Curated annotation (Swiss-Prot):
Pfam families: FGGY_C, FGGY_N. ATP binds at residues 13-15, 266, 309, 313, 410. PROSITE patterns: FGGY_KINASES_1, FGGY_KINASES_2. This is Glycerol kinase. ADP binds at residues 13, 17, 266, 309, 410, 414. One of its GO terms (molecular function) is ATP binding. It comes from Symbiobacterium thermophilum (strain DSM 24528 / JCM 14929 / IAM 14863 / T). Glycerol binds at residues 83-84, 135, 244-245. The keyword Cytoplasm does not apply. Homotetramer and homodimer (in equilibrium).
Length: 498
């Protein structure tokens, strides 16, 4: 039987997806199943791990049924996932001891504050590349051990397992035979030494997490094991695993140091490949593992922007400026410029490179002549300005000058935003033909490990341009506009600190 397909499982924050790619890297079929968001208290976010698994399994079954592709034609499975989200389960029964604590959940902020007060910030940064924050998995695991009755005792007896979502899916797909994660997901736990590629005993001891809970950390392109025929109906190698943003970097063929991509979703995630060098950030970025292939590990710098496309949703849902987010482009283009208006969408504070949780959203530069179109244009421009903030930090930390930016995510369909992004960065912006770069990255990693594709060079050749945008703004105008943005940001900072 000709194995002509790779199956990517893309387990996200709101839905579980299964996507089939053929040997050309073309999307053959996809299925998407949403699941519940659970909010037990303000600032707390959970998912039901059983629901994550059932929706993911159903997506696989449905995409095969819909495309008519048989399991015997699937060469390998790749997994990509929402990062940091934490599951602890019973090793014997496979049952979760508590709901999954989602990356957005802030309940462990007091644990983080205690850790910082004890002087751990420099050590955490040096070992893991991360800042101490409730975003990452480590304090979430500690919370489950400390707050769910009977769990700490079971953990100390070696009867429990922890994993990010990739490890939870691997465990279930293999019928409980494989407990493993990849380097990129491990690097988001705040428990993993990114230089030694090992769980850090000192941090585990400080957080009171028994080592027996932890999955084996393996390269991202690697055969983890085979699916249990009793679960899926056939034994298929699980051969590629990466966190969603790292998978998108790989799917965009950002294989060389200095290659960068920005994903425009609710927020924006920008990653720059730094090669075999884990570049420490002095500018509020995260140092993370991009992927491991064979015995080679590549690193990346990452900047997270909290509010990107969500600012456009705000204009639509709260201010009722338009009915569809896509209408923002025509409205923005109905005026020649923003009329001196700046919008700083710091609705939940500011992420990289500011990390100011007390910043709040502002609109400045209003005059009697300001209309909906000016505010809409300024809101779209704010996404591009925030990206420039992150890029400036990346270039400073890495010493690498960006020569082009690859883009993906929902908002890249907005041609006005993409052109302004190119203008304000002063570099070309490239939008690929295949929008599903995250799933494609997972498929590529799996296909490489099984010989379905021969090399990264072959994958780079498959990358195809949909549309390129080149800077059309004079340099002095670019810098004048950006200086205005920096002034606006200063006025937004620290607003809620009173």
């Amino acid at each position: 039987m000709n194995k002509g397909y790779v199956l990517a499982l893309d387990q996200g924050t709101t839905s579980s997806r299964a996507i089939l790619f053929n040997r050309d890297g073309r999307l053959v079929g996809q299925v998407n199943h949403e699941f519940r968001q659970i909010y037990p208290q303000p600032g707390w976010v959970e998912h039901d791990p059983r629901e994550i698994w059932s929706t993911q399994l159903r997506a696989v079954q449905d995409v095969l049924a819909r495309t008519g592709v048989r399991l015997s034609e699937v060469a390998a499975i790749g997994i990509t996932n929402q990062r940091e989200t934490t599951v602890v389960w019973d090793a014997e029964t496979g049952e979760p001891v508590y709901n999954a604590i989602v990356w957005q959940c802030r309940r462990t902020a007091p644990i983080c504050a205690e850790l910082a007060a004890r002087g751990w910030a420099p050590r955490i940064r040096e070992k893991t590349g991360l800042v101490i924050d409730a975003y990452f998995s480590g304090t979430k695991v500690k919370w489950i051990l400390d707050n769910v009755p009977g769990v700490r005792e079971k953990a100390e007896q070696g009867r429990l397992r922890f994993g990010t979502i990739d490890a939870w899916l691997i465990w279930n797909l293999t019928g409980g035979r494989v407990h493993a994660t990849d380097y990129s997901n491990a690097s988001r736990t705040m428990l993993f030494n990114i230089h030694q590629l090992a769980w850090d005993e000192e941090i585990l001891h400080e957080l009171g997490i028994p080592a027996s809970l932890l999955p084996r950390a393996l390269p991202s392109s690697h055969v983890y094991g085979e699916t249990d025929p009793a679960v899926l109906g056939a034994a298929i190698p699980i051969a590629g695993v990466a966190g969603d943003q790292q998978a998108a970097l790989f799917g965009q063929a950002c294989f060389q140091p200095g290659d960068a991509k920005n994903t425009y979703g609710t927020g924006c995630f920008m990653l720059m490949n730094t090669g075999d060098r884990a570049v420490p950030s002095e500018s509020g970025l995260l140092t993370t593992i991009a992927w491991g292939i064979g015995d080679r590990v590549e690193y990346a710098l990452e900047g997270s922007i909290f509010i990107g496309g969500a600012a456009v949703q705000w204009l639509r849902d709260e201010l009722r400026f338009f009915d569809r987010a896509a209408d923002s482009e025509a409205l923005a283009l109905s005026v020649p410029d923003s009329g001196g208006v700046y919008v700083v969408p710091a609705f939940v504070g500011l992420g990289a490179p500011y990390w100011d949780m007390y910043a709040r959203g502002i609109v400045v530069g209003l005059t009697r002549g300001t209309g909906r179109a000016h505010i809409t244009r300024a809101t779209l421009e704010s996404i591009a300005y925030q990206t420039r903030d992150v890029l400036g930090a990346m270039e400073k930390d890495s010493g690498i000058r960006l020569n082009r930016l690859k883009v993906d995510g929902g908002a890249v369909a907005n041609n006005f935003l993409m052109q302004f992004q190119s203008d304000i960065l002063g570099v070309p912006v490239e939008r690929p033909k295949i929008a599903e770069t995250t799933a494609l990255g997972a498929a590529y990693l799996a296909g490489l490990a099984t010989g379905f594709w021969r090399s990264q060079a072959e994958l780079a050749d498959k990358w195809a341009l949909d549309r390129g945008f080149t800077p059309a703004l004079p340099a002095e105008e670019r810098e004048r506009l950006y200086a205005g943005w920096r002034r606006a940001v200063e006025r937004a900072r620290g607003w809620a600190a009173e």
